[in-house]
Every structure is written in structure tokens, then in C-alpha cells.
């Protein structure tokens, strides 16, 4: 995002306080808040849901999105939680950690499967 012209919130707790704590403790694989998927986005198409639960371990976030990127998911407090580069094979970014959730979460597994499929096509 930044290299493409976007900006960041450098420290959410001090710059953009929220009722949602965006940095959870253990267990890291537990979903602690939801994200709303943007209808028509690749993530929405993959998961077929409007809202999913995610874990969270970040103190930075996208402030202004680069013009060439698209939002795929937002948290209830309005933070951008997932982006993509439209027209690319698989240039996605998520603020959560599907690697911690995958052992118990089918949505996380689907994200990894889509990534592997894009890499092998």
C-alpha cells in the first residue's frame, strides 16, 4: 500500500483509538472480532460469506488506500482489514493471521488453498 501511494496509521492505540482491541494475546488462533467482506471482492467470492471472524495482532493499519488497490474487508470500527490488487493473479493482503487460525478455521484454509492454486497455475 505505502509503496503504491497509500498511507498508514503508525500506532492505532495512540492515533485511532477504538473499542476493538486490534492486538490480542494468546490463543493467537482465536477469532476476536469480525470483518465484513466487500460484496464482489475476490475474498467474498472465495468464502461466500458477508462476515467472518478473525484474529488480530497489529498496531498499524491502512489509513489511506493506494489508488490501484481495492478493499476486500473492513472491521466494525471501519479499519481496512483486507486488500487486493485488481487484475492480479493473487496479490492479497490481510491484517489477521490465517496461519494461526487454519488448524481450526475452514475460511483460513480456503485462503491458503487459493494462494497455492494461484501459484501453481
Language-model features: where?
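A short helix-turn-beta junction within AAA+ P-loop NTPase domains corresponding to the substrate/partner-engaging
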Residues: 6
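Hydrophobic, aromatic-enriched interface-forming segments
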Residues: 1-3
